[in-house]
UniProtKB/Swiss-Prot annotation:
Molecular-function GO terms, alphabetical: calcium ion binding; calcium-dependent phospholipase A2 activity; heparin binding; phospholipid binding; toxin activity
Function field: Snake venom phospholipase A2 homolog that lacks enzymatic activity. Has myotoxic activities. A model of myotoxic mechanism has been proposed: an apo Lys49-PLA2 is activated by the entrance of a hydrophobic molecule (e.g. fatty acid) at the hydrophobic channel of the protein leading to a reorientation of a monomer.
Record's protein name: Basic phospholipase A2 homolog MT1
Pfam family, one: Phospholip_A2_1
InterPro entries recorded: PLipase_A2, PLipase_A2_Asp_AS, PLipase_A2_dom, PLipase_A2_dom_sf, PLipase_A2_His_AS
Amino acid sequence: MRTLWIVALLLVGVEGSLLELGKMILQETGKNAITSYGSYGCNCGWGHRGQPKDATDRCCFVHKCCYKKLTDCNHKTDRYSYSWKNKAIICEEKNPCLKEMCECDKAVAICLRENLDTYNKKYKAYFKFKCKKPETC
């Protein structure tokens, strides 16, 4: 089952420490990262590009910008450690870059939770060709 989860995340193109990011999103929102955010709006999941469609999509846009600031680690392949204590994500990494990557993922998971009321099903499987030119970070 764990292998299927990792393969599914790879197929939708979610970046970062895939397993950790997916778990954070589930813990914070109660939603499955793949089915709920894998192709949401213009910026969530694979093919992310374009003006955010709503606050939920903006969370993903800001997340991509956060990743662009990482310098000494690879957000597509490197993994980090975190824990879930008292309903809070705790980034436990000693490596500064991996800690920052964890903080990027933590921030998007919290942002998605804080914007659950903006989640719009019409953007769930949004066609990326409809997206307008992206703004810069």
